[in-house]
């Protein structure tokens, strides 16, 4: 996806960034795991603010960052509270991650999507379904129990045009 396409999908504003640049790697939230071509999403947590690691992510090869504030000299897609509803303002980059995942699914309409929900047994069921999905073709499923508002979009963003089956796990 190009930066312009991503900006439209997440209602973001390009800063220090060419709109034609493409993400050729993954969407990453841990700056220590950034590789060349990745897109880094700066998430503010209770103890650590991902915005502190944006410059390091670029230095490691990220093509840009999704951030909620401008970081001088860092190619960024800025999502601000002004672009969000009142329920979304607390974590604009988390919301942007979800919007980007939703957008990707619209670009890949032929993927079989299986969602596992409930209060117990989800991970085992998800693992069994992932094994079955592999019989159909390339399958994306979360490793472990990444079933929250960050893990679910990250799983979706692992998909590409070769993916046949997407297994998702969500706790209610």
Language-model segment annotations:
Residues 1-99:
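N-terminal leader/targeting and accessory segments in enzymes
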Residues 89, 93-172:
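Phosphate-binding loop of NTP-binding sites
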């Amino acid at each position: 996806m190009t930066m312009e396409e991503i900006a439209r999908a997440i209602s973001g504003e390009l800063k220090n960034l060419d709109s034609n640049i493409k993400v050729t790697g993954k969407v990453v939230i841990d700056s220590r795991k950034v590789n060349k071509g990745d897109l880094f999403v700066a998430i503010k947590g209770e103890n650590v603010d991902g915005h502190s690691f944006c410059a390091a992510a670029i230095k490691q090869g990220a093509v840009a960052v999704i951030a909620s504030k401008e970081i001088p000299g860092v190619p960024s897609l800025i999502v601000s509270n002004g672009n969000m509803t009142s329920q979304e303002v607390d974590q604009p980059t988390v919301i942007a991650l979800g919007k980007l995942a939703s957008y990707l699914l619209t670009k890949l309409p032929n993927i079989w999507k299986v969602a596992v929900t409930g209060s117990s047994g989800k991970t085992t069921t998800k693992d069994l379904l992932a094994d079955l999905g592999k019989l159909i073709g390339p399958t994306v499923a979360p490793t472990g129990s990444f079933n929250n508002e960050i893990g679910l979009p990250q799983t979706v963003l692992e998909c590409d045009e070769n993916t046949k089956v997407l297994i998702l796990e969500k706790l209610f």
